[in-house]
Amino acid sequence: MSDPMKTALSLVPMVIEQTNRGERAYDIFSRLLKERIIFINGPVEDGMAMLVCAQLLFLEAENPKKEISLYINSPGGVVTSGMAIYDTMQFIRPPVSTLCMGQAASMGSLLLTAGAKGHRFALPNARIMVHQPSGGFQGQASDIERHAQDIIKMKRRLNEIYVQHTGQGYEVIERTLDRDHFMTAEEAKAFGLVDDVIHYRAETEKEEKD
């Protein structure tokens, strides 16, 4: 059975631009990167995290003050991969705006709420899901015990991050994340995961004058 993600990527459209040196072709994602737009699409894993972190660092080097937009449609994935993206978002100087389109579940929801305060958005039909980390281990009993201790520490750290970005109390976060907890865009706003639900893009000053 073919991988839907690979199939989609093989169909990425090209954009042709006219420059003073003639025509130049970009794939659509490279063209959007020029506009400081990065996509997190699909499961969060090491390969994706490396690409997202590289794009964040590149855009910081290009302009350390101009906002970066992160568009998220992800079911979540590997915690350490997500934390690599999270730490890079906090590390770089430009503010990072986040927007959920489709879904932001598990690590996707953490990256959504990690955007700059006042710049975290969701589209009206987006779904957000939060929960505690999960894992399965095998081996010697002592190793399983150590893995269990580590995932408990990881759970505590993730809870602290949600507390920091949502403004909710630790007990509320712990209770909410105890099981899969699904939210509409408006519910995510009320909970503090996002700052606003966007129904349409506002006109710019230039567009209004035109």
From Swiss-Prot:
GO cellular component term, pick one: cytoplasm
InterPro entries in the cross-refs: ClpP (IPR001907), ClpP/crotonase-like_dom_sf (IPR029045), ClpP/TepA (IPR023562), ClpP_His_AS (IPR033135), ClpP_Ser_AS (IPR018215)
Cellular localization per UniProt: Cytoplasm
Record-annotated membrane-spanning stretches: none
Pfam families attached to this UniProt entry: CLP_protease (PF00574)
Keyword Protease recorded: yes
GO biological-process terms attached to the record: protein quality control for misfolded or incompletely synthesized proteins
Keywords for this protein: Cytoplasm, Hydrolase, Protease, Serine protease
EC number annotated for this UniProt entry: 3.4.21.92
One MF annotation (Gene Ontology) recorded for this entry: ATP-dependent peptidase activity
NAD found in the keyword field: no
Active site residues according to the UniProt entry: S106, H131
Source superkingdom: Bacteria
Gene3D superfamilies on file: 2-enoyl-CoA Hydratase, Chain A, domain 1 (3.90.226.10)
Annotated catalysed reactions: Hydrolysis of proteins to small peptides in the presence of ATP and magnesium. alpha-casein is the usual test substrate. In the absence of ATP, only oligopeptides shorter than five residues are hydrolyzed (such as succinyl-Leu-Tyr-|-NHMec, and Leu-Tyr-Leu-|-Tyr-Trp, in which cleavage of the -Tyr-|-Leu- and -Tyr-|-Trp bonds also occurs)
Subunit comment: Fourteen ClpP subunits assemble into 2 heptameric rings which stack back to back to give a disk-like structure with a central cavity, resembling the structure of eukaryotic proteasomes.
Family: Belongs to the peptidase S14 family.
Role summary: Cleaves peptides in various proteins in a process that requires ATP hydrolysis. Has a chymotrypsin-like activity. Plays a major role in the degradation of misfolded proteins.
NCBIfam families per the UniProt record, alphabetical: clpP, PRK00277.1, PRK12553.1
Protein name stated in the entry: ATP-dependent Clp protease proteolytic subunit
Organism ancestry: Bacteria, Pseudomonadati, Pseudomonadota, Alphaproteobacteria, Hyphomicrobiales
